[in-house]
């Protein structure tokens, strides 16, 4: 018997993602001028208001308000009619210094033995159903949102689009976990009130709302989806069919949105950020945290390990868990689940022991392996932290306190497949 599985994504204009992007933009600014900075920055946004809170230990000052406003404007909140825009919103900052107690637990004379910034468990996952070893449901949901944002920013078609949006993709799987077809695609997008009623009656308003909805649904099917499909390989493209159930703005009108429609908070989209409900999640959010926080760095490391293991052919699917105690450098446990899809004559426990022997899993070693002290985090804060393109980009940082810095930054280092040959040798593949 087949089954259905769904994953969702949200746009960069979703209130929670606005918060994530502000937190990570501030983190990047600190790391650009002070790579050793320790940060835990939380952002809250609502109608006309942003609150930036958290703990920082750094030798440098940065202009929090300027960076926050720039980030909001870049997302697309630039009009007063949105009831939230980067130029006029109020910004309250409440940043204070990191606790000495936490700093003592993390800092060591020997940097290699830097302790974990907190206790907790972190998971990494990979599956071979897409080219980037991600669940196809989440990969498509992200691509729909990213493509919709590109259409909005180009401003040539679907010119009524506003920044807030969500998507959800449901795929039918066979009993053995192979994707068969796309069953349902949900797209909810904020929009201008672009068709006005002919008079003040309720009937005229209903007629105008229905006309807007019909236009948006037609554009999603005839403009957005073809652009999404044009970016796909044959394997995923084959999942599209003539019987997909398209649910576009199912509640009807979606004019009020963004932080005016819902409050946003850093760290509230952790399943969107990771694997769309597949694998597992330890509960720790990423954005605003420097890599001494294993919530972030160890989650990236487990993804790196799982992806390279699946790419090497150890298993068709793999979940890796690391768990840490605050102040301790080495993980207290390493766990592997291959879901019965392993191609090596080993138990999952034996595979875990090989991983522990192959990879240095101390926090400072993870930072070095994945080059996590770079200002590389704003790009992670929308459309997923996993399954993204590893590339080197030029970034420019300006500050009224410091000289302008131009840097080459390597993004999504945990997506590299540079351990495949080593893993094949280790496992005799």
Label each region the model flagged.
Residues 46, 315-317, 324-429:
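Internal helix-turn-beta structural module
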Residues 6, 66, 73-77, 81-256, ...:
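Glycine-rich, mobile lid/loop segments that gate access to catalytic sites or pores
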Residues 8-10, 14-19, 115-130, 255-280, ...:
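Conserved phosphate/anionic-ligand binding catalytic regions in large, soluble enzymes, centered on
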Residues 1-40, 45, 420, 426-429:
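N-terminal, positively charged regions that mediate nucleic acid binding
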Residues 270, 275-321, 330-337:
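C-terminal catalytic subdomain
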Residues 4-11, 49-57, 92, 122, ...:
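Short glycine-rich or small-residue beta-strand-to-loop segments that form or flank ligand, phosphate
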Residues 12-31, 126-150, 289-313:
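Alpha-helical support elements that line or immediately flank enzyme active sites
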Residues 40-58, 326-330:
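Short, charge-patterned binding micro-sites
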């Amino acid at each position: 018997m087949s089954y259905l599985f769904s994953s969702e994504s949200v746009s960069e204009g979703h209130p929670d993602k606005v918060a994530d992007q502000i937190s990570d933009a501030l983190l990047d600014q600190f790391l650009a001028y002070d790579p050793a900075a320790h940060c835990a920055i939380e952002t809250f946004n609502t109608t006309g208001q942003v609150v930036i809170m958290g703990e920082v230990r750094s030798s440098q000052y940065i202009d929090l308000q300027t960076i926050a406003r720039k980030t909001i404007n870049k997302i697309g909140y630039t009009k007063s009619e949105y009831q939230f825009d980067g130029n006029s919103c109020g910004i309250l900052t409440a940043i204070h210094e990191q606790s000495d107690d936490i700093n003592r637990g993390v800092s060591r004379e020997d940097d290699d033995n830097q302790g974990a910034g907190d206790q907790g468990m972190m998971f990494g996952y990979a599956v071979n159903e897409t080219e980037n070893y991600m669940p196809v449901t989440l990969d498509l949901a992200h691509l729909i949102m990213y493509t919709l944002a590109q259409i909005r920013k180009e401003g040539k078609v679907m010119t009524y689009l506003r920044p807030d949006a969500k998507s959800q993709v449901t795929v039918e799987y066979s009993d053995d976990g192979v994707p068969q077809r796309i069953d349902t695609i949900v797209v909810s997008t904020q929009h201008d009130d672009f068709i006005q009623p002919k008079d003040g009656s309720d009937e005229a308003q209903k007629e105008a709302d229905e006309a807007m909805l019909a236009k948006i649904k037609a554009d999603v099917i005839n403009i957005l989806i073809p652009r999404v499909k044009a970016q796909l390989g044959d394997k995923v493209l084959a999942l599209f069919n003539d019987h997909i159930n398209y649910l576009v703005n199912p509640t009807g009108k979606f004019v009020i949105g963004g932080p005016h429609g819902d409050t946003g908070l850093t760290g509230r989209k952790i399943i969107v950020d990771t694997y769309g409900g597949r694998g597992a999640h330890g509960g720790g959010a990423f954005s605003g945290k420097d890599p001494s926080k294993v919530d972030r760095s160890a989650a990236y490391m487990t993804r790196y390990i799982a992806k390279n293991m699946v790419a090497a052919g150890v298993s068709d699917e793999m979940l890796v868990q690391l768990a840490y105690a605050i102040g301790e450098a080495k993980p207290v446990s390493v766990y592997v689940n291959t879901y019965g899809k392993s191609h090596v004559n080993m138990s999952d426990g034996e595979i875990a022991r090989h991983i522990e022997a192959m990879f240095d899993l101390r926090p400072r070693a993870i930072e070095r392996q994945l080059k996590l002290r770079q200002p590389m985090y704003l790009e992670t804060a929308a459309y997923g932290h996993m399954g993204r393109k590893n590339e080197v980009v030029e970034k420019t940082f300006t500050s009224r306190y410091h000289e302008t810095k131009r840097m080459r930054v390597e993004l999504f280092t945990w997506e590299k497949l540079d351990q495949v040959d080593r893993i094949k040798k280790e496992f005799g593949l």
